[in-house]
Amino acid sequence: MPRLVLASAPAKIILFGEHSVVYGKPAIASAIDLRTYVRAEFNDSGNIKIEAHDIKTPGLIVSFSEDKIYFETDYGKAAEVLSYVRHAIELVLEEADKRTGVSVSITSQIPVGAGLGSSAAVAVATIGAVSKLLDLELSKEEIAKMGHKVELLVQGASSGIDPTVSAIGGFLYYKQGEFEHLPFVELPIVVGYTGSSGSTKELVAMVRRRYEEMPELIEPILESMGKLVDKAKEVIISKLDEEEKFLKLGELMNINHGLLDALGVSTKKLSELVYAARTAGAIGAKLTGAGGGGCMYALAPGKQREVATAIKIAGGTPMITRISKEGLRIEEVRE
């Protein structure tokens, strides 16, 4: 049995189809190469101990025993991550039918609350690290299902997109609860974070209100978004060369952003980052996720640095990254 395991899992972006997916339309999501790292090892206390050094918020150390939670420090949003980690560890211990002290230490490149799936990534990386520590053989699909279960326990509702993308990696086409893996395309992207986040629940409710008040206007927008996702899928699986794929996907990104703007989920800051990216040479740029803040992303072959600079000048936090073919990764095992 190993004495220490280090695992990592990637963030995700919704490439196409946010909001319309709520109405039964498809969406395409992908893993991106921003990662959360979880180190797991045994401890002698018999408790679960979580150290969160860097979740893009100040660190904290928390110990759980059967009936008490010990907070050594307490800083804002970092605390939100703890429920995911605790449930992830407990599910693995339950699956392995073991009760032992486990310490996990978390470091992350993924900002919390930015719509990039930070909660799913930490849950998946924790399940991967702790299951390996306990010599429990789980497939990536099984880990994705456990990650989905963690989200249900913490959030009460979840489509399962985030943990599935984080565990398995690459591109995922999602429609009404069913997943389909798409061929891998290397997309050079830049993610821009506005520094604030909107409430997914409130934004979904706002779109629902508009849909109920003006179905004759909103239904065609949602219908167009669904068709756009299927068009993007066609491009991804086509035999077109890389440059042609980029051009077509970029055009679809720009249309998708316009449709999301028409639904009312973009913000002044998101649009500023989107247009700054396009002006700097991005082929396409759009918001990703619920909107109301959070992130946008730009497709910028050969122009990632220029686009990142433009996003920074426009007041955003740029992250140069790429689509991650790999999902969950075991980085290190010490016997």
UniProtKB/Swiss-Prot annotation:
Its EC number is 2.7.1.36. Keywords: ATP-binding, Cytoplasm, Isoprene biosynthesis, Kinase, Lipid biosynthesis, Lipid metabolism, Magnesium, Nucleotide-binding, Transferase. InterPro entries: GHMP_kinase_C_dom, GHMP_kinase_C_sf, GHMP_kinase_N_dom, GHMP_knse_ATP-bd_CS, Mev_gal_kin, Mevalonate_kinase_arc, Ribosomal_Su5_D2-typ_SF, Ribsml_uS5_D2-typ_fold_subgr. It is found in: Cytoplasm. One of its GO terms (biological process) is isopentenyl diphosphate biosynthetic process, mevalonate pathway. Disulfide bonds: none annotated. One of its GO terms (molecular function) is magnesium ion binding. It catalyses: (R)-mevalonate + ATP = (R)-5-phosphomevalonate + ADP + H(+). The active site is at residue 162. The keyword Transferase applies. Its main location: cytoplasm. It comes from the Archaea. It holds the Pfam family GHMP_kinases_N. GO terms for cellular component: cytosol. Its cofactor is Mg(2+). Pathway: Isoprenoid biosynthesis; isopentenyl diphosphate biosynthesis via mevalonate pathway; isopentenyl diphosphate from (R)-mevalonate: step 1/3. Catalyzes the phosphorylation of (R)-mevalonate (MVA) to (R)-mevalonate 5-phosphate (MVAP). Functions in the mevalonate (MVA) pathway leading to isopentenyl diphosphate (IPP), a key precursor for the biosynthesis of isoprenoid compounds such as archaeal membrane lipids. Belongs to the GHMP kinase family. Mevalonate kinase subfamily. PANTHER family: MEVALONATE KINASE. Homodimer. This is Mevalonate kinase. It comes from Pyrococcus abyssi (strain GE5 / Orsay).
